[in-house]
A protein has these predicted regions:
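N-terminal catalytic or cofactor-binding beta/alpha core of small enzyme domains
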Residues: 1-131, 138-160
């Protein structure tokens, strides 16, 4: 199934959707900033009933604002080691997050996803994007710059199609 169809299926459900997009990453580690860049792109779109959070490397610090927003859906976006071509994006279910270590960060996203699902009764998924480099450096690689534009458009179209 194509990414757009997977996201549209993920966002199905509640009529009054309240969506959180949680961008995770480090702005000083090249492609690790992909989640933050996607949040920046989406903020310029002015989407209603959506909370966009650039969580840097500590997404657990934003559970308070997420809880107050009362989300129906939480989409975490992060650079994710999946052994794929750089820039490849894949929607990863909470069940798959629990079974493997995907993130480039120390906090297991499985714990954060489980906490959000259990305490806020929201659907949770990880949109992982394969990095090329997570070395110290401020710029995304060309592959990830292209992925930011492509994936951001897919997220935007999937949300407004709800």
């Amino acid at each position: 199934m194509a990414l757009k169809e997977e996201l549209m299926k993920f966002f199905e459900g509640e009529e009054d959707k309240r969506i959180v997009v949680l961008g995770i990453g480090s702005s000083i580690r090249s492609d690790d900033a992909v989640g933050l860049e996607i949040i920046r792109y989406l903020k310029n779109k002015g989407i209603k009933n959506i909370l966009l959070i650039a969580a840097d490397t500590n997404p657990e610090s934003f559970t308070g604002p997420i809880r107050r927003f009362k989300p129906t859906h939480v989409l975490m976006v992060d650079a994710t080691h999946m052994g794929l071509e750089p820039g490849t994006a894949e929607l990863i279910s909470i069940e798959r997050i629990r079974g493997q270590w995907f993130s480039t960060h120390h906090l297991p996203l499985s714990e954060l996803a489980a906490f959000i699902k259990e305490t806020m009764n929201a659907k949770v998924a990880l949109l992982g994007i394969q990095p090329k480099s997570i070395s110290i450096g401020s710029d995304l690689t060309l592959e990830l710059k292209k992925a930011v534009e492509r994936v951001s458009k897919i997220i935007y179209e999937s949300i407004i199609a709800k």
